[in-house]
């Protein structure tokens, strides 16, 4: 019963066969048209009459393969009634059945009898010139039932033709002007074998040469003069099936096709209502399925030619489709109905308005009118689409679509300026492109010293826009390729004075799915090769070459609207949404979010629909989606609501003043500072947190440093951008990375708050002496902290990093480093920081710097001890005179090391240690602790003579320099009411995390063993950390005697820096060293002690095994991997 009612609701959609097209000959091309057509064509009205000259060459004794009927003694004028398959006339692709022959070699046939015409054609000679008249193809107008789309087709010449006949073209009489129309496709020819082109299609361009405004003769000449391979831009028609859009149940679609021709549909499987169903996955452009307009991506295939697909596999369904005859009957459930079943849980309700969308109303306008909705793009969901967004196709039997010559805008529909562009073009194509290029060059020149992304200009319809660029990587699809087409200069060989534009994006192609590309975007470079100084043909060739590797990288320039940029308050943003294409926004829930708090936009994809509006910014609050409030929605629910939206998405946004970079709205002063470091430090310390939208603050300046000397940077200033990279929505670690990669010239965008804002700001930046930063300044020591509760003794600060050290080039030793701690005294207790060095090392001299802020090591206090320590202050016990004397001593030692060429390594050690410890502290410690009195990376700035870090050189018996790197001290957050169990747990976790690990530098000279002809050690690449490490050491060999240990990292080999090398580069250096080998190595003592505790057997030292070696946890998670090399 269900099946019966199911069938009764099916509607029938019938498509005519493509052979019923008025431009298509019969398959054999041997039958003349019927008598009715012959009588109708006896006289062509003057306004529909076209003419051309056909030149044929034949050898003596051969015929043209042409059958002519008519004459003065017959009914009608001489006309072509048949073209023999394979004959000269047929292969010329200039004649069609039904053409009238007016003259042969200048001889008018108006008064010739039929037999005289035949005799003339036989005896005319080798060169035959025919004057031919034909009926102009009818005009096809885009309306409610037909839409235009374009497709790019690449064909190879056969002889000197592509296997199709063209008619139409521009004419002096406007009533006779037509686009260049393909009226016949020769069976078996190149176009027929390729299968895309059908009679009635319009030829828009050949190898980028636009045919708009060209005559028929000029179009023929362009086709003849192009190369053996040409790319043709074809426009075809797709019918709009209202019955599909309004259907409430299954449909029976009948599609007629030529036997053996492909329908152009790719199938896949999906799950609907817990059952597997066969679904249309892709539809090939300009295929029969595309042109009929009844099939869409996502439609469920219920049956094929009466065979149910309920229990069929994908392979079986594909085979059924391939075996169909000239009449295909498909029972489908349209995709707009299937989406209802595929939607998420019912607790999310979305009600859509029945009002007409802007592009629906605009679709009925003339195709040459420009649109202000610059995000309108075609999607299969739309039953009607805007003109010139190139929707889907016309039924094969429809008359060839044409642009009416009488319409002043219709002919410009094919011009570049009338394309419906997603990007607002900088100017119309007719304006001077050199001016655009000059503005672009000036913009690039100014960009170096300015943080504005681009200067504002006026786009279409007077809208203010600015340009931005982005890089897009596309992976080709087997069916649709990349899915983009370019529009360039008039002549393919002409050098482009402005970049080519994207003129078409195919639906459901990689170009559309990436969500970044839109029609009208300028293609600046293809695979890194600029397009501005090349020809359009070269640009197209780059795209074709990329299709071989199925990957292309495009640099795109696009426009971002900025006519309306809300500075604060609540407003609505409407974004067009396409199926399977994301809007480009990422929403997140702050860790401190409470019920009723909004979600935050944490990322906006560059080039996406959301980005191009120019109104959305990182940090904006998302209040509602399509009038569904998100106050109590989780982030997952909000994402689901976004995904279920269709066609048009309405977002309710709230922008706070503190999230605005505008001076007028925020009341702040915003300016740009450019610093040239000339190899030195910047002299600034930045502070922040790992929360994306917490500010990055300048917390201290080095006295007399570069930043302080400018006079434009002050403590408390907020950094908005570093070298044009905005810090909005980025954590402190990202800002650190940007500073490290900044190079010699660093451009900072600074926001200086007003006094009122500074006073009322809830976030307080650390002041010198209480900052959680490592500085290289020489400020006065901080005052001793007053006794009080623990929340006062351990002030709340934010983690920070001294950019003066972070700015040094390169990455140092890839390990975590330990601390030579200072001594502190409290209430009669003396505590030392935990020292990992051996007793022998502790006897060496070590600097004890002046403390600026108090650090508190793990001292194992009991509950009572903790209570007692809250009532007493911590007093630093270092002697200032001794410290000053030791600073002078170690300053000389550092200078000595610099003269030996080791200063770069020291700086790298500092930088890497800083980054490692900072990131570890910020992530792990923040995970362990909670509460408002949390302080991360709290440490006193050290004297500049110590390069901003505590550094100790330890005299060893081998006279090798030993360098120990300090970690940052961390204050322990606590509340008075914390329980002892929690304190013990936190102390234990902090002890495990913050256990210091020293690093040693050694210079080793080895002499080759004369007996073994090697240096007695093997090396291996690091697995998790780059670099080359000592793996095994032969007992009593040169390496063992010289003091090498497993896990030693080779920093230099014979004075060649090998920090970034692998075994393939290091082994040849060692092999070329002869009998003497000079090494500079870095060592983690823990790894060496571990290797001593577990010595390798003598027989194991050179084994080439595949095992991975992992260093102990305090050694930076070092692992080595094959290949190993015995040296």
From Swiss-Prot:
Entry comment on modification after translation = Palmitoylation of isoform 2.
Residues with PTM Phosphoserine: 43
GO biological process annotations for this chain's record? neurotransmitter receptor transport, endosome to postsynaptic membrane; protein localization; vesicle-mediated transport in synapse
Classification via Pfam families: PDZ, PDZ_6
Annotated stretches, region: Disordered: 752-802, 840-865, 942-980, 1108-1127
Subcellular locations according to the entry:
Cytoplasmic vesicle; Perikaryon; Cell projection, Dendrite; Cytoplasm
- Please list the residue ranges that the record marks as compositionally biased, kind Polar residues: 840-856, 947-973
As for membrane topology, the entry says: Peripheral membrane protein
UniProt tissue specificity: Expressed in brain. Isoform 2 is the major isoform in brain. Expressed in oligodendrocyte lineage cells.
The protein's name is Glutamate receptor-interacting protein 1
Instruction: From the UniProt record, report the name of the gene that encodes this protein.
Output: Grip1
